[in-house]
Each structure stands twice: as C-alpha cells, then as structure tokens.
UniProtKB/Swiss-Prot annotation:
Keywords: DNA damage, DNA repair, Endonuclease, Hydrolase, Metal-binding, Nuclease, Zinc. Zn(2+) 2 binds at residues 145, 179, 216, 261. Binds 3 Zn(2+) ions. One of its GO terms (molecular function) is phosphoric diester hydrolase activity. This is Probable endonuclease 4. Its EC number is 3.1.21.2. The gene is nfo. The lineage of its organism: Bacteria, Pseudomonadati, Pseudomonadota, Gammaproteobacteria, Enterobacterales.
C-alpha cells in the first residue's frame, strides 16, 4: 500500500497537523514537533501528547505513515565540539518528542563539515552522533535524508549514506529518506524510466532498500547536477512527472511515507490525488 501526503503545518498544536493531512485526503504526513528554527522548545504536555494520539487514531494514521522532521539548526557532523554537543542534545530531544508522541521515525539532514574537517571525519562524527542519540532513547528510527550537496552539506552521494549506516551500531534503528529533488540536483538522473531504473538500482546496491524508510517527492527548479536545492511542483520542474508515477507503481516504495514538500501547498490535494491515481496504471516492462 502507498502512503502519500505532504509536510503539513503544526501551527496551533501537533494535533492540527493530523487534521490538515486528513483534509488533504492524505494517507501520510510529515510535521515538525517543535519550531524548526529554534534550539529549544517547551516539553510536550501530557494533554498535547494525548490529543495528538487520539487525533491520529480518529483519522486512521499509524506511526508508519508519519515522518516527523527535526530542526534545521542541528548539525550532527559539526567540526566544533561545543556546537556539536549542542546539536546532539537537540537531536536527542527531537527523538524523545517523537517517542512521547508514539512516532517511530525521525527524518534529519546528516550534517556539514563547514570546510573545517574532511568528509570522512564529518561522516564519522554524524554516525557517532546517531549512536549517542540512539543509546539515549528507544523505539524511534533515525532516518537520514540525502541532500543536494549545497555548500558543505554531506549526504549528496549514496555512498555517504552507506558510510554513516556502516558505523551505526543498531542497524534496526537507522534508515534513509530519499528526496527526488535533492537526488536530481546531486547528479542522480530521474527524468526517464531508464534513469529511474539506473538511479534506484544504485540506491539498492550502495545503501540497500531494506533501509528505505521514506521519500520526499519534489520536482526541481534547480538544474541537473547543480548541487542547488530548489523544489518545484510535480511536473513543473526539470525532473518531470515520470519518476513520481514510477514510484507509485513500484512495490519497493510501499508502506513508507511518500511526502510532498512542493512549493504550492494550494495544489497539494490535487498532487496527492494524482499520485494515488498512478497506482492504477500497469507497471512498464
């Protein structure tokens, strides 16, 4: 089964994200459990936690259909010890919040070396950060997102994701989320069925589909291999609609959140309906 939705606002309370997803007729959704541009947030109150869980139950969302995202401020590969510790503490707090809400996944960007340490050192720091955070929490899987490779961000190569996973001690609690815009901007072509076959074969070989825990379905304003992260609405960017139809028809992408982060939220309901319609098309041979 395909779980399709969008990254919805949690303004007014995390339970409001559930309602917004339901209004889109989404079968999945993403959210921030706190203000993503602040380091600290008040702990989740018991009534807030209970309201979120009851609203999920009311509208039929399980933890397998929900892909929360952590704060953009966190850098688990930070080259400066003090800043790294701050990021690690914040990441643990994000995992705890997910744990309290009954969520099983936490999506995050791996980290940046800021031109101060080399890639391998940064990847090792990211893995160490994940190990520390997983040791301090339970029940939530750390889901590493591929990046476009802007600036000094790592995670733009599938090999980066594989290198991090290799160093994570509890393999049962680590996974990946593949963003189509990021992949395209990082040099993984997705414009034709043949391109999709090639790119996802590489993902399977280098990372392994057993680690795929979610997808971000975004077209790209940015050019192929530009290392620039600019999302667009489905079919309106440089990738086109082929890959999104491909994903909806391929069972390797079943039972994970497939999340829109496209630029026009006014057409999310239409985009979700179109994605759902693609499951009825026979797969290409």
């Amino acid at each position: 089964m395909k779980f399709v939705g969008a990254h919805v606002s949690a303004a007014g309370g995390v339970d409001q994200a559930v309602i917004r997803a339901h209004e889109l007729e989404a079968t999945a959704f993403a959210l921030f459990t706190k203000n993503q541009r602040q380091w600290r947030a008040a702990p989740l109150a018991e009534d807030v936690i209970e309201k979120f869980k009851l609203t999920c139950e009311k509208y039929g969302y399980t933890s397998a259909q929900i892909l929360p995202h952590d704060s953009y401020l966190i850098n688990l590969g930070h080259p400066v010890t003090e800043a790294l510790e701050k990021s690690r503490e914040a990441f643990i707090d994000e995992l705890v919040r997910c744990q309290q809400l009954g969520l099983s996944l936490l999506n995050f960007h791996p980290g940046s070396h800021l031109l101060q340490i080399d890639e391998d050192q940064c990847l090792a720091r990211i893995a160490e950060s994940i190990n520390i955070a997983l040791d301090a929490t339970e029940g939530v899987t750390a889901v590493i997102e591929n990046t476009a490779g802007q600036g000094s961000n790592l995670g733009f190569k599938f090999e980066h994701l594989a290198a991090i996973i290799e160093k994570v001690e509890d393999k049962s609690r680590v996974g990946v989320c593949i963003d189509t815009c990021h992949a395209f901007a990082a040099g993984y072509d997705l414009r034709t069925e043949e391109d999709c076959e090639h790119t996802f074969a590489a993902l399977g070989k280098i990372v392994g589909f057993q680690y795929l825990r979610g997808m971000h379905l975004n077209d790209a304003k940015s050019e192929f291999n530009s290392r620039v992260d600019r999302h667009h609405s489905l079919g309106e960017g440089n990738i086109g609609k082929t890959v999104f139809s491909y994903i909806m028809r391929d069972s390797r992408f079943d039972n994970i959140p497939l999340i829109l982060e496209t630029v026009n939220m006014d057409i999310w309901a239409e985009e979700i309906a179109w994605l759902k319609s693609q499951t009825e098309i026979e797969p290409s041979l």
